[in-house]
């Protein structure tokens, strides 16, 4: 393995950790909130009728994240949606370590500014336990996606799981990473 360190991880260890320790008066370095994982998922409800769209979604996710995507299956049958338990209806990728920092860096600094009429991400996307979720309406904001080759424009979800105890700590952590929260 090389001794390569992602830019955001370096920023975290050199700048963000001391700032957070000072801001929240932590007694131990282990109390400082950190990123655990980033989950990128795509729900493809239309996959029930057109299997090709699910494969396209998997390919898009793999292109965006640089890691193999897993197809997700329906947990329950819902008659109104013509959905059976076990049907493949989406895809997801869980990123950890260096890939997580690289993805978050690209997401914050390259993809989000390409969103039409972008005024910042919703500051209410926290779940009460220090995790943040944001929905993206078009996958074409990522430069890796070739506009001419996509089957269908679809959205995706990005969940950032942190070790923070409260939403305030998590918001401070993500803001220091450069997440552009709406005022």
Swiss-Prot record:
Biological function: This is one of the proteins that bind and probably mediate the attachment of the 5S RNA into the large ribosomal subunit, where it forms part of the central protuberance. In the 70S ribosome it contacts protein S13 of the 30S subunit (bridge B1b), connecting the 2 subunits; this bridge is implicated in subunit movement. Contacts the P site tRNA; the 5S rRNA and some of its associated proteins might help stabilize positioning of ribosome-bound tRNAs.
Record-given protein name: Large ribosomal subunit protein uL5
Any one GO MF annotation of this record: structural constituent of ribosome
GO CC aspect terms: ribonucleoprotein complex; ribosome
Protein family membership: Belongs to the universal ribosomal protein uL5 family.
SUPFAM superfamilies, A to Z: RL5-like
HAMAP family given in the database record: Ribosomal_uL5_B
């Amino acid at each position: 393995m090389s001794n390569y360190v992602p830019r955001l991880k370096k920023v975290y260890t050199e700048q963000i950790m001391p700032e957070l320790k000072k801001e929240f008066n932590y007694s131990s370095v282990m109390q400082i909130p950190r990123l655990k994982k980033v989950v990128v998922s795509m729900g493809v409800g239309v996959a029930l009728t057109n299997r090709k769209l699910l494969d396209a979604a998997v390919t898009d996710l793999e292109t965006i994240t640089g890691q193999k995507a897993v197809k997700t299956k329906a947990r329950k049958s819902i008659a109104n949606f013509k959905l059976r338990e076990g049907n493949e209806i989406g895809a997801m990728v869980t990123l950890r370590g260096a890939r997580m920092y690289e993805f978050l860096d690209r997401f914050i600094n390259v993809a989000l500014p390409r969103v039409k009429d972008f005024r910042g991400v919703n500051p209410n996307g926290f779940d009460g336990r220090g995790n943040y979720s944001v929905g993206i309406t078009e996958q074409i904001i990522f430069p890796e996606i070739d506009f001419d080759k996509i089957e269908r424009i679809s959205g995706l979800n990005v969940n950032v799981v942190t070790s923070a105890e409260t939403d305030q700590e998590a918001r401070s952590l993500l803001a220091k990473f450069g997440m552009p929260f709406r005022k």
